Swiss-Prot record:
<comment type="similarity">
    <text>Belongs to the RapZ-like family.</text>
</comment>
<feature type="binding site">
    <location>
        <begin position="62"/>
        <end position="65"/>
    </location>
    <ligand>
        <name>GTP</name>
    </ligand>
</feature>
<keyword id="KW-0547">Nucleotide-binding</keyword>
<keyword id="KW-0342">GTP-binding</keyword>
<dbReference type="InterPro" id="IPR053931">
    <property type="entry name" value="RapZ_C"/>
</dbReference>
<dbReference type="Pfam" id="PF03668">
    <property type="entry name" value="RapZ-like_N"/>
</dbReference>
<keyword id="KW-0067">ATP-binding</keyword>
<dbReference type="GO" id="GO:0005524">
    <property type="term" value="F:ATP binding"/>
</dbReference>
<dbReference type="Pfam" id="PF22740">
    <property type="entry name" value="PapZ_C"/>
</dbReference>
<dbReference type="InterPro" id="IPR027417">
    <property type="entry name" value="P-loop_NTPase"/>
</dbReference>
<feature type="binding site">
    <location>
        <begin position="12"/>
        <end position="19"/>
    </location>
    <ligand>
        <name>ATP</name>
    </ligand>
</feature>
<dbReference type="InterPro" id="IPR053930">
    <property type="entry name" value="RapZ-like_N"/>
</dbReference>
<protein>
    <recommendedName>
        <fullName>Nucleotide-binding protein ELI_02120</fullName>
    </recommendedName>
</protein>
<dbReference type="InterPro" id="IPR005337">
    <property type="entry name" value="RapZ-like"/>
</dbReference>
<comment type="function">
    <text>Displays ATPase and GTPase activities.</text>
</comment>
<dbReference type="GO" id="GO:0005525">
    <property type="term" value="F:GTP binding"/>
</dbReference>
Amino acid sequence: MSGRLDVLLVTGMSGAGKSTSLRVLEDLGWETLDNFPIRLLEPMIGEVLSSDNPAPLAVGFDSRTRGFVPNEIIELCKRLVQRDDLTLTTLFLDCTSEELERRFNETRRHHPMARGRTALEGIRAEREVMEPLRRWAEAVIDTSELAANELQQLIREQFHHDDPASQSVTVSSFGFARGMPPLADLVFDMRFLDNPHWVANLREQTGLDPAVGEYITARGDFDEIFQRMRDLILALLPRYRAQGKAYVHVAFGCTGGRHRSVFTAETMAQALREAGFSPTVVHRNLASRAADQFEGPQGRN
Protein backbone atom coordinates (compact mmCIF):
# COMPACT_ATOMS: atom_id res chain seq x y z
CA MET A 1 0.00 0.00 0.00
CA SER A 2 1.07 3.63 -0.34
CA GLY A 3 0.49 6.36 2.19
CA ARG A 4 -0.42 5.93 5.84
CA LEU A 5 -3.13 3.81 7.42
CA ASP A 6 -5.58 5.77 9.57
CA VAL A 7 -6.07 4.01 12.91
CA LEU A 8 -8.68 5.34 15.34
CA LEU A 9 -8.88 4.02 18.90
CA VAL A 10 -12.36 4.54 20.34
CA THR A 11 -12.65 4.29 24.10
CA GLY A 12 -14.31 5.99 27.04
CA MET A 13 -16.87 5.54 29.75
CA SER A 14 -19.32 2.64 29.50
CA GLY A 15 -22.61 4.00 28.22
CA ALA A 16 -21.06 7.14 26.70
CA GLY A 17 -21.60 6.13 23.06
CA LYS A 18 -18.78 3.83 21.92
CA SER A 19 -21.05 1.34 20.14
CA THR A 20 -22.99 4.14 18.45
CA SER A 21 -19.75 5.74 17.25
CA LEU A 22 -18.39 2.47 15.87
CA ARG A 23 -21.60 1.83 13.92
CA VAL A 24 -21.32 5.26 12.29
CA LEU A 25 -17.65 4.68 11.48
CA GLU A 26 -18.53 1.36 9.85
CA ASP A 27 -21.13 3.12 7.71
CA LEU A 28 -18.42 5.60 6.70
CA GLY A 29 -16.21 2.81 5.38
CA TRP A 30 -13.98 2.16 8.37
CA GLU A 31 -13.14 -1.42 9.30
CA THR A 32 -14.34 -1.63 12.89
CA LEU A 33 -13.45 -3.98 15.74
CA ASP A 34 -15.09 -3.78 19.16
CA ASN A 35 -13.62 -5.10 22.41
CA PHE A 36 -10.63 -6.39 20.45
CA PRO A 37 -7.89 -7.87 22.71
CA ILE A 38 -5.27 -5.17 23.17
CA ARG A 39 -2.33 -7.58 22.85
CA LEU A 40 -3.47 -8.44 19.32
CA LEU A 41 -3.69 -4.84 18.11
CA GLU A 42 -0.17 -4.54 16.68
CA PRO A 43 -0.38 -7.87 14.80
CA MET A 44 -3.79 -6.84 13.47
CA ILE A 45 -2.41 -3.52 12.22
CA GLY A 46 0.40 -5.40 10.49
CA GLU A 47 -2.11 -7.67 8.77
CA VAL A 48 -4.19 -4.71 7.60
CA LEU A 49 -1.11 -2.90 6.29
CA SER A 50 -0.12 -5.95 4.25
CA SER A 51 -3.40 -5.94 2.33
CA ASP A 52 -4.12 -4.01 -0.86
CA ASN A 53 -5.95 -0.68 -0.40
CA PRO A 54 -6.91 -1.29 3.23
CA ALA A 55 -9.81 0.59 4.77
CA PRO A 56 -9.07 2.84 7.75
CA LEU A 57 -9.22 0.90 11.02
CA ALA A 58 -11.30 1.81 14.09
CA VAL A 59 -10.82 -0.26 17.24
CA GLY A 60 -13.14 0.05 20.22
CA PHE A 61 -12.19 -0.93 23.74
CA ASP A 62 -13.07 -0.07 27.32
CA SER A 63 -12.67 -1.38 30.86
CA ARG A 64 -14.32 -4.70 29.87
CA THR A 65 -11.83 -5.48 27.10
CA ARG A 66 -9.48 -8.41 27.65
CA GLY A 67 -6.01 -7.18 28.57
CA PHE A 68 -7.25 -3.71 29.51
CA VAL A 69 -4.47 -1.96 31.45
CA PRO A 70 -4.55 1.80 30.72
CA ASN A 71 -0.86 2.52 31.25
CA GLU A 72 0.14 -0.41 29.01
CA ILE A 73 -2.26 0.82 26.33
CA ILE A 74 -0.72 4.28 26.49
CA GLU A 75 2.76 2.79 26.07
CA LEU A 76 1.47 0.90 23.03
CA CYS A 77 0.06 4.15 21.63
CA LYS A 78 3.40 5.87 22.15
CA ARG A 79 5.05 3.19 20.03
CA LEU A 80 2.42 3.39 17.33
CA VAL A 81 2.59 7.18 16.94
CA GLN A 82 6.29 6.85 16.12
CA ARG A 83 5.57 4.72 13.08
CA ASP A 84 5.64 6.30 9.64
CA ASP A 85 3.17 3.85 8.06
CA LEU A 86 0.11 4.85 10.08
CA THR A 87 -1.62 7.83 11.68
CA LEU A 88 -3.01 7.08 15.14
CA THR A 89 -5.81 9.04 16.81
CA THR A 90 -7.43 8.25 20.16
CA LEU A 91 -11.06 9.27 20.72
CA PHE A 92 -12.40 9.28 24.30
CA LEU A 93 -16.16 9.39 24.83
CA ASP A 94 -17.00 10.98 28.16
CA CYS A 95 -20.22 11.71 30.04
CA THR A 96 -21.14 12.98 33.49
CA SER A 97 -21.60 10.34 36.17
CA GLU A 98 -25.17 11.47 36.81
CA GLU A 99 -26.16 11.15 33.14
CA LEU A 100 -24.51 7.73 32.87
CA GLU A 101 -26.41 6.57 35.95
CA ARG A 102 -29.65 7.78 34.36
CA ARG A 103 -28.88 5.92 31.13
CA PHE A 104 -28.11 2.65 32.91
CA ASN A 105 -31.24 2.93 35.04
CA GLU A 106 -33.37 3.78 32.01
CA THR A 107 -32.13 0.80 29.98
CA ARG A 108 -32.03 -1.49 33.06
CA ARG A 109 -28.53 -2.56 32.16
CA HIS A 110 -25.91 -3.32 34.79
CA HIS A 111 -22.76 -1.23 34.83
CA PRO A 112 -19.73 -3.53 34.26
CA MET A 113 -17.98 -2.29 37.41
CA ALA A 114 -21.08 -2.17 39.62
CA ARG A 115 -20.98 -5.74 40.88
CA GLY A 116 -21.93 -5.66 44.54
CA ARG A 117 -22.37 -1.87 44.53
CA THR A 118 -24.59 0.82 43.06
CA ALA A 119 -24.38 1.91 39.43
CA LEU A 120 -23.06 5.32 40.48
CA GLU A 121 -20.30 3.73 42.55
CA GLY A 122 -19.34 1.55 39.58
CA ILE A 123 -19.28 4.59 37.28
CA ARG A 124 -17.02 6.48 39.66
CA ALA A 125 -14.68 3.50 39.93
CA GLU A 126 -14.50 3.21 36.15
CA ARG A 127 -13.83 6.94 35.77
CA GLU A 128 -10.78 6.64 38.01
CA VAL A 129 -9.49 3.72 35.95
CA MET A 130 -10.11 5.49 32.63
CA GLU A 131 -8.63 8.88 33.57
CA PRO A 132 -5.12 8.19 32.15
CA LEU A 133 -6.65 7.39 28.75
CA ARG A 134 -8.80 10.51 28.86
CA ARG A 135 -5.70 12.61 29.44
CA TRP A 136 -3.89 10.85 26.60
CA ALA A 137 -6.67 11.13 24.00
CA GLU A 138 -6.36 13.80 21.29
CA ALA A 139 -10.13 13.94 20.87
CA VAL A 140 -12.66 14.02 23.72
CA ILE A 141 -16.40 14.13 23.11
CA ASP A 142 -18.66 14.83 26.08
CA THR A 143 -21.96 13.14 25.24
CA SER A 144 -23.78 14.22 28.41
CA GLU A 145 -26.23 16.45 26.56
CA LEU A 146 -26.15 14.77 23.16
CA ALA A 147 -28.97 12.76 21.66
CA ALA A 148 -27.86 9.70 19.69
CA ASN A 149 -28.45 11.42 16.35
CA GLU A 150 -26.36 14.43 17.46
CA LEU A 151 -23.43 12.17 18.37
CA GLN A 152 -23.79 10.35 15.06
CA GLN A 153 -23.61 13.64 13.17
CA LEU A 154 -20.49 14.71 15.06
CA ILE A 155 -18.75 11.44 14.26
CA ARG A 156 -19.71 11.73 10.60
CA GLU A 157 -18.41 15.30 10.38
CA GLN A 158 -15.13 14.64 12.15
CA PHE A 159 -14.17 11.18 10.89
CA HIS A 160 -15.61 10.79 7.41
CA HIS A 161 -12.84 9.23 5.36
CA ASP A 162 -12.28 10.47 1.85
CA ASP A 163 -9.92 9.28 -0.82
CA PRO A 164 -6.31 9.50 0.48
CA ALA A 165 -5.56 12.25 -2.03
CA SER A 166 -8.28 14.45 -0.54
CA GLN A 167 -8.34 16.29 2.76
CA SER A 168 -11.03 17.14 5.28
CA VAL A 169 -10.76 20.73 6.53
CA THR A 170 -12.79 22.17 9.40
CA VAL A 171 -12.86 25.93 9.94
CA SER A 172 -14.26 27.01 13.30
CA SER A 173 -14.79 30.03 15.50
CA PHE A 174 -14.63 30.06 19.29
CA GLY A 175 -14.47 32.35 22.29
CA PHE A 176 -11.38 32.30 24.49
CA ALA A 177 -13.68 32.92 27.47
CA ARG A 178 -14.83 29.31 27.13
CA GLY A 179 -11.46 27.79 26.37
CA MET A 180 -9.60 26.86 23.20
CA PRO A 181 -10.85 23.95 21.04
CA PRO A 182 -8.60 20.99 21.94
CA LEU A 183 -8.86 19.44 18.46
CA ALA A 184 -7.56 22.47 16.54
CA ASP A 185 -4.36 22.12 14.51
CA LEU A 186 -4.00 25.85 13.75
CA VAL A 187 -5.34 28.56 16.07
CA PHE A 188 -5.47 32.26 15.17
CA ASP A 189 -6.20 34.89 17.82
CA MET A 190 -8.37 37.64 16.33
CA ARG A 191 -8.55 39.77 19.47
CA PHE A 192 -6.23 42.36 17.89
CA LEU A 193 -9.25 43.57 15.88
CA ASP A 194 -11.61 46.22 17.25
CA ASN A 195 -14.46 44.48 19.06
CA PRO A 196 -17.97 45.05 17.62
CA HIS A 197 -19.37 44.01 21.00
CA TRP A 198 -18.74 47.54 22.23
CA VAL A 199 -20.80 49.08 19.43
CA ALA A 200 -24.37 49.27 20.69
CA ASN A 201 -26.13 48.48 17.43
CA LEU A 202 -23.76 45.57 16.68
CA ARG A 203 -23.68 43.91 20.11
CA GLU A 204 -26.65 41.61 19.50
CA GLN A 205 -25.55 40.81 15.95
CA THR A 206 -22.90 38.24 15.03
CA GLY A 207 -20.14 37.79 12.50
CA LEU A 208 -22.76 36.32 10.17
CA ASP A 209 -24.41 39.73 9.83
CA PRO A 210 -23.11 42.05 7.05
CA ALA A 211 -22.92 45.07 9.35
CA VAL A 212 -20.41 43.31 11.60
CA GLY A 213 -18.25 42.34 8.63
CA GLU A 214 -18.32 45.89 7.32
CA TYR A 215 -17.25 47.21 10.72
CA ILE A 216 -14.34 44.76 10.96
CA THR A 217 -13.01 45.28 7.44
CA ALA A 218 -13.30 49.07 7.64
CA ARG A 219 -11.00 49.30 10.65
CA GLY A 220 -7.37 48.26 11.09
CA ASP A 221 -5.43 46.00 8.76
CA PHE A 222 -7.87 43.11 8.45
CA ASP A 223 -7.46 42.60 4.71
CA GLU A 224 -3.67 42.47 4.84
CA ILE A 225 -3.57 40.15 7.86
CA PHE A 226 -6.28 37.93 6.40
CA GLN A 227 -4.36 37.45 3.15
CA ARG A 228 -1.27 36.43 5.10
CA MET A 229 -3.28 33.90 7.12
CA ARG A 230 -4.87 32.59 3.93
CA ASP A 231 -1.49 32.17 2.24
CA LEU A 232 -0.09 30.37 5.29
CA ILE A 233 -3.03 27.96 5.52
CA LEU A 234 -2.95 27.19 1.80
CA ALA A 235 0.79 26.54 2.05
CA LEU A 236 0.39 24.22 5.05
CA LEU A 237 -2.56 22.10 3.88
CA PRO A 238 -0.66 20.17 1.17
CA ARG A 239 2.26 19.71 3.55
CA TYR A 240 -0.06 18.22 6.17
CA ARG A 241 -1.52 15.95 3.49
CA ALA A 242 1.95 14.82 2.42
CA GLN A 243 2.56 13.72 6.01
CA GLY A 244 -0.60 11.61 5.97
CA LYS A 245 -2.79 14.02 7.92
CA ALA A 246 -6.29 13.58 6.50
CA TYR A 247 -8.04 16.00 8.85
CA VAL A 248 -7.04 19.62 9.55
CA HIS A 249 -8.91 21.90 11.93
CA VAL A 250 -8.28 25.66 11.62
CA ALA A 251 -9.77 27.70 14.47
CA PHE A 252 -10.23 31.45 14.89
CA GLY A 253 -10.80 32.86 18.36
CA CYS A 254 -11.95 36.11 19.89
CA THR A 255 -13.18 37.02 23.36
CA GLY A 256 -16.78 35.83 23.14
CA GLY A 257 -16.71 33.85 19.91
CA ARG A 258 -19.59 35.75 18.30
CA HIS A 259 -18.19 38.58 16.16
CA ARG A 260 -14.56 38.76 15.01
CA SER A 261 -13.84 35.02 15.01
CA VAL A 262 -17.12 34.18 13.28
CA PHE A 263 -16.58 36.70 10.49
CA THR A 264 -12.98 35.58 9.95
CA ALA A 265 -13.93 31.89 9.90
CA GLU A 266 -16.66 32.51 7.34
CA THR A 267 -14.33 34.59 5.19
CA MET A 268 -11.58 31.95 5.38
CA ALA A 269 -14.01 29.16 4.53
CA GLN A 270 -15.02 31.05 1.40
CA ALA A 271 -11.36 31.57 0.46
CA LEU A 272 -10.72 27.84 0.86
CA ARG A 273 -13.73 27.01 -1.32
CA GLU A 274 -12.31 29.26 -4.01
CA ALA A 275 -9.04 27.32 -3.70
CA GLY A 276 -10.81 24.00 -4.31
CA PHE A 277 -11.45 22.77 -0.76
CA SER A 278 -14.82 21.91 0.78
CA PRO A 279 -14.44 23.02 4.40
CA THR A 280 -16.87 22.24 7.20
CA VAL A 281 -17.71 25.38 9.19
CA VAL A 282 -18.48 25.22 12.92
CA HIS A 283 -19.25 28.24 15.10
CA ARG A 284 -18.86 26.87 18.61
CA ASN A 285 -20.47 29.75 20.47
CA LEU A 286 -23.26 30.17 17.94
CA ALA A 287 -23.96 26.55 17.09
CA SER A 288 -26.04 23.90 18.77
CA ARG A 289 -24.94 22.35 22.00
CA ALA A 290 -23.74 19.36 19.98
CA ALA A 291 -20.91 21.29 18.37
CA ASP A 292 -20.16 22.96 21.68
CA GLN A 293 -19.78 19.64 23.47
CA PHE A 294 -17.59 18.22 20.70
CA GLU A 295 -15.02 20.96 21.10
CA GLY A 296 -14.44 20.09 24.73
CA PRO A 297 -15.36 21.16 28.24
CA GLN A 298 -16.66 24.65 28.75
CA GLY A 299 -14.53 27.21 30.48
CA ARG A 300 -15.72 30.04 32.64
CA ASN A 301 -17.83 32.77 31.06
